[in-house]
A protein has these predicted regions:
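Short hydrophobic beta-strand that contains or immediately precedes a catalytic carboxylate
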Residues: 17-19
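C-terminal accessory helical subdomains adjacent to catalytic cores in phosphodiester-
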Residues: 2-14, 23-54, 58, 65-224
Length: 224
């Protein structure tokens, strides 16, 4: 290896992912590794569920402190002196895009950065399934019969009230394999493998914010 640092120094730092469940964390990991290939082998996860978006004040500070402590703990388990290069905390807003999304994202991310310095709050609107609806061909690649109805294509998926219901009842339908939350990592793997992430069919502000955060993190935290 050359003297110049490239990507993440795995022996000294890791990226930590926290999220609502394993499916969300694995999905985030797939997307992060695509955008920052140097992270492969350098991502670790916190298994505890995240509950931040409704918290404020001292309650928010306490919950973020718990996550930060766990992040530093899992980093230390990778080897003495290992630091957290960056922390990604995912949560679904369970509400559509709007002022509440912006205010919540800002409030929580500011607290994460106040306590750790290098972190991103990945708040999906209304939930991560809304991101999947940006990639109809990826959904069909997972299950050929899965089709996104025309009325949902090319739209702002952050405005859909219940993306999960759309996937379960209208995309996957009632015949054959029906979408479940455990399909999420496979769907995002298909998004990456097919190169669909480069040209989403529609928009979602939380998706755009996530990719902007990954690019920013790559420049500021992961490269020496």
């Amino acid at each position: 290896m050359s003297g110049r640092k490239s990507g993440l120094e795995r022996s000294r730092s890791v990226v930590v992912i926290a999220g609502e469940d394993r499916n969300d964390r694995e999905s985030l990991k797939i997307l992060l590794e695509e955008q920052q290939p140097g992270l492969r082998g350098g991502i670790v996860q916190i298994r505890d569920p995240v509950r931040l978006h409704k918290a404020t004040g001292a309650n928010l500070s306490k919950r973020v402190r718990t996550i930060v402590n766990k992040a530093q703990g899992v980093a230390e388990k990778q080897g003495e002196g290992t630091r957290v290069a960056c922390l990604y905390v995912h949560e679904d807003l369970d509400g559509v895009d709007g002022n509440v999304y912006l205010e919540t994202r800002q409030r929580v991310e500011q607290e994460i950065r106040r306590q750790l310095g290098c972190g991103h709050y990945v708040l999906a609107v209304a939930e991560m399934e809304a991101w999947m609806l940006l990639f109809p061909d990826a959904l069909s690649a997972v299950v050929k019969a899965w089709k996104v109805p025309a009325k949902y294509r090319g739209k702002d998926t952050g405005r859909f009230q219940d993306p999960k219901r759309i996937l379960m009842r209208e995309v996957s339908g009632t015949k054959g394999r029906r979408y479940t939350e455990s399909d999420a990592p496979e769907v995002f793997r298909a998004v990456i493998d097919g190169g669909y992430h480069r040209s989403p069919l529609g928009s979602n502000r939380s998706w755009s914010h996530f990719y902007q955060d990954v690019e920013l993190c790559g420049r500021q935290h992961l490269h020496g």
